[in-house]
Each structure stands twice: as structure tokens, then as C-alpha cells.
Amino acid sequence: MGSKLGFTFGVLFASLLLISRASAEENGKWLDVQLPHDSPVLLVGFNMSPTTVTVRRSSMLLDLHETLVLRNVGNQPICGLTLRVEAQDLTPYGKGSVIKPSLFVLPGEEFPVKVDMQLIRPISATKSESAMVQVTLDCALFSNLTAYGPDKLNSRRTLMVYEKEARRDRQYLAHLLDTGQLPELREELNFGIQDVAPRQLGLELLRGPRTAAVREQALAVNPMPFPKAAVQPLRGAAQVAGNEVRAPRVEVRNISKMRVASVAMGWVVRDDRGDDFVAGAVTSPVVIGPVQTSSISESGTLRFSRSTGQPMVIDKLMAFVNDVQFSDGTLWIPSRADIDAATQDPELRREL
């Protein structure tokens, strides 16, 4: 009986796999890159590495590996790009994105964009006449910090933060070179440092209910202020269990004369060994008037993990303002002087 079931399942699996592949071929291709007629980039070609389909119940798992070659057909240098990649848009597992920050692609130049991700597509969707995966342009950022695209993923803000940080760091390195501060320049570029791996920590934002009850403890969130930050963290609190932080809340004050539209709070985690890690930032839409105070809270759970996968225990939490977007669309990011004043730890400075 078991062998018959196994044989039947194997035949069904092979049939579904052939159907999905045949569908992709009959309907044109695996991939369809859809760019508007006035798009600043043009698809020149793509190289598809081994891409596989695995049937899982009523869905297909698409393991995508490909490289798109795009050309800048606009009249301005492109400094960043975000593509939307969708197998179906009904669930979060059927769509993703690829971001290429800190570029400098002149008009007429070509550049590669790698797409490496897994997406889920319903088997019933193979009857559609469209390709199995659709790629569209979400946002292109130009050198003058204007942008093109629907920006459904809020990509413009992300690309602008990357670009402003890159310009800040390039300006600082150029200053070190111009003033002959070669030892400092070598340290910034990690020249002469043997086998030094940066301290990395992963950050996940979980919004679903917890699967099991865990013992939590209250933990204060200590502010790490930048001297000239437009928004200053004042105090905060959270519930902590192991490597998870639930419902963190930080009180902040807008000390500028501009209205704030969103704030990205960065997190520094100290583990039970006394090591500090910069664990990323979470952007929150929050309107704060000039010289006003507000609270930034997260209803979900922040889960921190080591890059090695080893368990960790959170001993201390610190919060800093990673960037601020004002109502007119402009952005504030910390200067190098702000970062130097925030901490004396050289590794933490480098990560900030």
C-alpha cells in the first residue's frame, strides 16, 4: 500500500512539475520584466542561472537565480534602484524586492541586477497567460535626489538614506586623504587589520501572535543621542525574553523647527557577555510638530540573533535615531561628528 501511494505521489509530483514548466514555456517565459515607456532604465538582457520549482501541496516554491542587465536611458546618473519581484500578490510569500543602493550609473551605461530569492505561487495560477514571475520598477533615484517610479515599497526613502550615508562617508574619507591623515584613513578602510570580523546581529520584526508563553522581564531602553540630531530619544521601555523584545516604546522629542513625517529608530543590543551590537533600524511613520514630544512604539516583537545562529540573551537595550524624514521629503542623517560623539567604542562607531 505504501509503495503504491509513493508511486502515485511521485507521478503526481512529476506531472505538476511538468505542467508548471510547460505552462511557463507555453505562456512565453519564466520571467517578464515590465517597464513603463518613460522608464529611465531599459532591459538589455538577462542570464538565468539554475532556477527550480518545487511543488508544495497546492503551491509551487520558485527558487529564483538570475541576473538582469539594465541600461540607463535617462539623462541623469542613477544612484539607486529598487525592483519589485512578484509570483502572485495575494500573500507576502509571493512577492519580494531587490534594492541596489549607492550606484553611479551614467546615461548610456549598463549595470547588472541580481535576483536571488524564493517565492510561492499557487499551482492554479499556472493557467494564467502571464509569466510565472513579473519584475517591475518601484523606484529609481537620480544623482540630484529626485526619483522616478510608483514607490509602493517606500523605496525612495530607503535609497535616499543609503545615498546620503555614502556621500557622507566619501566626503569624510576624502577629508582624511586631503589632510594627510593616512593612519586614520587606513583604519577606516581596515587596511593592516588581520582577520577582524565585524560584530553582526540579525533583526527580525515579528507581527504574529506568539506560539508559546514565555517569561518576560521589563527592561529600560537607554537613549544613545547624537548631539545635532533633529529628533532626540529621551527614554523608553520594553518587555524582554531571551533574544526577543516585545512592544518596545521610545519617547522622542523633535528639537527642529520642521514637521517630522517618519523616524527610523536604530537599536544597539548588549548581550550577557558585555558585547554591543548594532542590530539595524525600524522606520515608523509618526507626525511630530516642531519642538514637540511624541512616542514611537512597535506592536510587534523584535527578534535579535547572532550571525552564527548561536543563542543570545539581551542584557541591555539602547536606541538611537538612525534617520528622520520631514514632511517636505527632506532627510536628516547623523554626521561623522555625531557618531564620534555618541560612543568611544571604535567598532561600534564603524557599525554606526
Could you tell me what each predicted segment is?
Residues T8-L18:
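Bacterial N-terminal signal peptides
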Residues M1-F7:
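Positively charged n-region of N-terminal signal peptides that target proteins for export
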Residues I123-N144, S305-S327:
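Short, surface-exposed ligand- or partner-binding patches at beta-edge/loop junctions that are enriched
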